[in-house]
Amino acid sequence: MIVFKNKVISLEDEQYSLYLLNKPKGYICSNAQDNKNRVIDLIKSNSRLYTIGRLDVNTTGAILVTNDGDLANKLLHPRYDKEKKYLVRTFIDIPKDKYIKLKKGLNIGKRQKAKGVIKRIKKENKHIYWEVILTEGKNREVRRIFKELGSAVIDL
């Protein structure tokens, strides 16, 4: 609402949208104009859109997209301590004594520690499926965790 000299000039209700999108490989979660294949370009909207979460270009999966910047901030900013859940597929089975180290913190790079929970879900044919729960989700964090544990990620 805009008021000028005690008179209402315009009254607009903000309309917020929230989309659940199955992000395909080859698309990035960025608003930068110079990037090709942005997730937000898959949705026709006249509003500025924000991805809630970051999945790297080679990752597929559910991602939320909204035009509500406050909601995006509350779900993304580390101070709100929101969990992010990932399903990971690997070829290599990792011993439990290795992957439980993530609870206390696992070194994944230069002065970077990842904290979270990994749970082995099932083994199917040659593949092992894992559930990973993190509260941050830094740049390629899940892939770096599995690399540190001695396994490459097939699908994320």
Question: Which residues make up each language-model segment?
Answer:
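Basic, flexible Lys/Arg- and Gly-enriched helix-loop patches that mediate nucleic-acid binding at interfaces
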Residues: 1-156
